Amino acid sequence: MTDADVDPIQPLDVSELSDGWAEECDVLVIGLGAAGLASSIAAAEAGASVIALDRSGGGGTSASAGGILYLGGGTSTQVEAGLSDTAEEMRAFLAEALGRDIDDPRLVAYCEGGVEHHDWLVAHGVPFEPAFWDEPGMEPPGTEGLIYSGGEDASPYRQHHRPVARGHVPATPNAAGWFLVERLREALERTAATVLTDQRAERLVVDGGRVVGATVRADGTVRAIRANSGVVLACGGWAYNEALLAKYAPKLLDIAWRLGTDGDDGWALRTTLGLGAEIEGMSTMEVAVPVTPPRSVVRGVIVNGEGERFINEDTYFGHVGQAILRDQDGVAWLLTDEPNYVVNRVGMRAENVCETWEELAGEIGLPPEKLAATMAAYNEAAARGQDPQFHKAAEWLVPLDTAPFGAIDLRVATILYAGFPLGGTRIDEHARVVRPDGSPIDGLFAAGRAASSLALAHYCSGISLGEGTFFGRRAVAEMFSTREVLNLK
């Protein structure tokens, strides 16, 4: 990557098309991950002519994701699982968890449309088992369709909001992201949409300030495709553009695994910048620490390089990873004792084992007296079922006082963290790409990681797929003013 890889990609004026338009449609969708598939389906079912293209075979990062969709407000899956929820409760929680204003129109639209969007997904072949997995973790062990996926049941949120599970997991024993994409792909195949793979969009085409199409490269030739109603960018983010990462989110360059594909090269971001779009949340990131239940992991203690706790261990694993990378210079250790040690799901083991906390501290390079004091204070409070420092739930509090003691290495430099940037092109509640003054760029829409996330502070698993598919459809509703036809608010 070079400095040129951060430069805006300027649009092409329609007058510069030497060969005119090779193809024409109502809606041009660029990218066929979950967001692009949802947008393409919605447009085709609304009666529009659709050309949907992807630089590879489709699926994108969505196909390799965990498949969770963050939905709520009282979905049928929630109700059948015995859980109650409202759009207002969902919005209040997400406003705090994601760092959005509670009256942000985009957040309001997403929460108020959650039930309808859930039903649309189900109607298009994405089932959810009405069963609730109530323990911390990245995903349920079976086909349970509901999980806590944003620390809803942990501090600080449980002090302010009634915990509600909103992470909806498609009913499949494994590879839920791939399953979601396949079901949406099958739904798209039942429409009249034209699907083009191995075709790369190069530049958007404008006419008098309106986006009217794009140039596309395939098999060494470039042609122009006209879009009479609008262009939807759903072609991924910028996790694999190291020049953009260095400029906006340099800490992501320190982790071993950036979630994405080579399609996450920042093309959508650079293209919208070329049209004067506003960007937001560029330093915000999701970073997952690869420590998952069993319970023993949550019952352990996480300390930084000074031997001090800095977070409640029962919270969402993305919050833990973000705190380690952003606030602790990438240094952390998970401490446990003999009765509570079990190898966690990803096989991480306590490589350092000692008879005292002081000895363990010396072995892993922490201040012995400080670590001993940390553990003494924690154990004393845990014996009373309390955590006055970080308010870990009582069910996960046990004294760690039975030798030998072990340390699992959570340092960013030594284990496989996974993450991706959440910032990007700002869109409004109708998925329109907007300028810094809030005015929309006519004819241009974005969804998924081609747009900025709702998450401006912290992340909740399922937001990317949830908002991507939701705003992919929302773009179509705005193009055709078919909110009633599509049953969108």
Task: Provide a role label for each language-model segment.
Residues 27-51:
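N-terminal Rossmann-like FAD-binding beta1-loop-alpha1 element of flavoenzymes
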Residues 45-65:
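Glycine-rich FAD pyrophosphate-binding loop
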Residues 109-222, 242-243, 385-407:
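Conserved redox-cofactor binding core of oxidoreductases
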Residues 265, 269-271, 275-372:
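An anion/pyrophosphate-binding glycine-rich loop and adjacent beta-alpha core
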